[in-house]
From Swiss-Prot:
Gene Ontology terms describing biological process: DNA-templated transcription; symbiont-mediated activation of host NF-kappaB cascade; symbiont-mediated arrest of host cell cycle during G2/M transition; viral genome replication
Official protein name in the record: Protein X
Role played: Multifunctional protein that plays a role in silencing host antiviral defenses and promoting viral transcription. Does not seem to be essential for HBV infection. May be directly involved in development of cirrhosis and liver cancer (hepatocellular carcinoma). Most of cytosolic activities involve modulation of cytosolic calcium. The effect on apoptosis is controversial depending on the cell types in which the studies have been conducted. May induce apoptosis by localizing in mitochondria and causing loss of mitochondrial membrane potential.
Keyword terms: Activation of host NF-kappa-B by virus, Activator, Apoptosis, Host cytoplasm, Host G2/M cell cycle arrest by virus, Host mitochondrion, Host nucleus, Host-virus interaction, Modulation of host cell cycle by virus, Transcription, Transcription regulation
A GO CC term assigned to this protein in UniProt: host cell mitochondrion
One Pfam match: X
Species whose genome carries this gene: Woodchuck hepatitis B virus (isolate 2) (WHV)
Similarity field: Belongs to the orthohepadnavirus protein X family.
Keyword Zinc part of the UniProt annotation: no
InterPro entries in alphabetical order: Transactivation_prot_X (IPR000236)
Length: 141
């Protein structure tokens, strides 16, 4: 069975937070540095409630030397699972209209917060199903 993980990038600490999606599991926990992070294990942030990750349901590829294969993303809207696309290509295409790639994250956050405050958030913003191999299935919230 594929592991279901919920991921969130904490840019303030440069940490990718992964949490099991579904039934809770027990086991040791540790923070996972974000992809592309130059931080070494000695300079990684100290564990906290926000960055703990139960290991009981993680896929075998998670601890591989080259990193988890969940970093090779495909994505699809849950309502149109027939047409999956490569997440990296989709993300790059969405950025083409932006004057700077640095503006991408603030732009999306601003759009999400505005829609949330207006009470008109589109459910499609939270139903991308991400995956990259047979080891796991991730949902981006």
């Amino acid at each position: 069975m594929a592991a279901r993980l919920c991921c969130h990038l904490d840019s303030a600490r440069d940490v990718l937070l992964l949490r099991p999606f579904g039934p809770q599991s027990s086991g040791p926990s540790f923070p996972r540095p974000a992809a592309g992070s130059a931080a070494s294990s000695a300079s990684s942030p100290s564990p906290s409630d926000d960055s703990d990750l139960p290991l009981g349901r993680l896929p075998a590829c998670f601890a591989s030397g080259s990193g988890p294969c969940c970093l090779v993303f495909t994505c699809a809207d849950l309502r149109t699972m027939d047409s999956t696309v490569n997440f990296v290509s989709w993300h790059a295409n969405r950025q083409l209209g932006m004057p700077s790639k640095d503006l991408w994250t603030p732009y999306i956050k601003d759009q999400l917060l505005t829609k949330w405050e207006e009470g008109s958030i589109d459910p499609r913003l939270s139903i991308f199903l991400l995956g990259g191999c047979r080891h796991k299935c991730m949902r981006l919230l």
